[in-house]
Swiss-Prot record:
One GO term (biological process): translation
Pfam family of the protein (one): Ribosomal_L19
PROSITE patterns documented for this protein: RIBOSOMAL_L19
Annotated keywords: Ribonucleoprotein, Ribosomal protein
Gene designation: rplS
Name of the protein in its database record: Large ribosomal subunit protein bL19
Organism: Streptococcus suis (strain 05ZYH33)
GO annotation, cellular component aspect: cytosolic large ribosomal subunit
Record PANTHER family: LARGE RIBOSOMAL SUBUNIT PROTEIN BL19M, RIBOSOMAL PROTEIN L19
Organismal lineage: Bacteria, Bacillati, Bacillota, Bacilli, Lactobacillales
C-alpha cells in the first residue's frame, strides 16, 4: 500500500475490536439514524465471511429472522458500529461459510469451541 495512504488511514483504525473469525456468533451494536434521532440496533448472527485488510476490511453476519435469512455486511473500522461482542466461538474449516445459505434448521448449526 502507498505509504501516504497508509499514514492517513492509521489514525482511523479502531483498537477496540475483539478478535473473531468466520463461524463465530457475534452481537453487533449498530447505530441507526431514524429521522433526527439515533438509536442502537443489535444484530446477532454468525460471521460467514471476513474480507479485505486495513481500513477497508469488511465482515458479513447472517441470522435467521422470522424464518428468513438476513445478512448484513459491516466495515470493521466504521464509527457506525458502537461495539462488537463475541457470543460464541465456532469451529469451522472454511474461511467463507456461504454454504450456510442453503442449509436450514439443525443442519446449519456450527460446533462450538471453548476458549
Amino acid at each position: 500500500m502507498n505509504p501516504l495512504i497508509q499514514s492517513l488511514t492509521e489514525g482511523q483504525l479502531r483498537t477496540d475490536i475483539p478478535s473473531f473469525r468466520p463461524g463465530d456468533t457475534v452481537r453487533v451494536h449498530a447505530k441507526v439514524v431514524e429521522g433526527n434521532r439515533e438509536r442502537i440496533q443489535i444484530f446477532e448472527g454468525v460471521v460467514i465471511s471476513r474480507k479485505g485488510q486495513g481500513i477497508s476490511e469488511m465482515y458479513t453476519v447472517r441470522k435467521i429472522s422470522g424464518g428468513v435469512g438476513v445478512e448484513r455486511t459491516f466495515p470493521i473500522h466504521t464509527p457506525r458500529v458502537d461495539k462488537i461482542e463475541v457470543v460464541r466461538y465456532g469451529k469451522v474449516r472454511r474461511a467463507k461459510l456461504y454454504y450456510l445459505r442453503a442449509l436450514q434448521g439443525k443442519a446449519a448449526r456450527i460446533k462450538e469451541i471453548r476458549r
